[in-house]
């Protein structure tokens, strides 16, 4: 996937086009003073990210406390 990069001034001046690019073409990196500052992604992509993050957090909790939780559930 190609990630477009624009500087802050360009992003601000062309916000609608940058947002459309994030929705239809993939993530857009915003730079400030030559350094990566932020990434704009579509709402759909953000939801997938959030779901994956919650799945990872749940797996980590279960790895640490899974046995205790199963024992409590069996009581």
Swiss-Prot record:
Biological-process GO terms, alphabetical: regulation of DNA-templated transcription
Q: Which SUPFAM superfamilies does the entry mention?
A: YefM-like (SSF143120)
Family note: Belongs to the phD/YefM antitoxin family.
- Biological role stated in the UniProt entry: Putative antitoxin component of a toxin-antitoxin (TA) system; its cognate toxin is unknown.
Coiled-coil annotated residue ranges, if any:
none
Protein name (database record): Orphan antitoxin YefM
Gene Ontology molecular function: any one: sequence-specific DNA binding
Q: Which gene encodes it?
A: yefM
Pfam short name (any one)? PhdYeFM_antitox
Organism listed in the record: Salmonella typhimurium (strain LT2 / SGSC1412 / ATCC 700720)
UniProt KW Transmembrane keyword: no
């Amino acid at each position: 996937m190609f990630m477009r990069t624009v500087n802050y001034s360009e992003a601000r001046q062309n916000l609608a086009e940058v947002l459309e690019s994030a929705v239809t073409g993939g993530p857009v990196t915003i730079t400030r003073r030559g350094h990566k500052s932020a990434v704009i992604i579509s709402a759909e992509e953000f939801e997938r990210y959030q779901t994956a993050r919650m799945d990872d957090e749940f797996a980590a909790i279960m790895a640490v406390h899974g046995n205790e939780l199963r024992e409590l559930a069996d009581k």
